[in-house]
Amino acid sequence: MLLVVIFGLVALFALWGVLRSVRNKNILGFLLAGATLFVFGWFTVMTVINSGYPTAH
């Protein structure tokens, strides 16, 4: 359960980074934050689908 929360928080911070880098016209920041958002967002979704929330034993 804690893993989903951590992945979700990282994905939210990455979303904030994407929006901030677009506003500042920072291409490298956009690419890195976008990649982080994609990876951790995918991990969050797959962890919820696989393990459920709260975690099913």
UniProtKB/Swiss-Prot annotation:
It is found in: Cell membrane. It is a multi-pass membrane protein. The keyword Cell membrane applies. InterPro entries: DUF2759. Keywords: Cell membrane, Membrane, Transmembrane, Transmembrane helix. Pfam families: DUF2759. It comes from Bacillus subtilis (strain 168). This is Uncharacterized protein YqgW. Coiled coil: none annotated. The chain crosses the membrane at residues 2-22, 29-49. GO terms for cellular component: plasma membrane. The keyword Plastid does not apply.
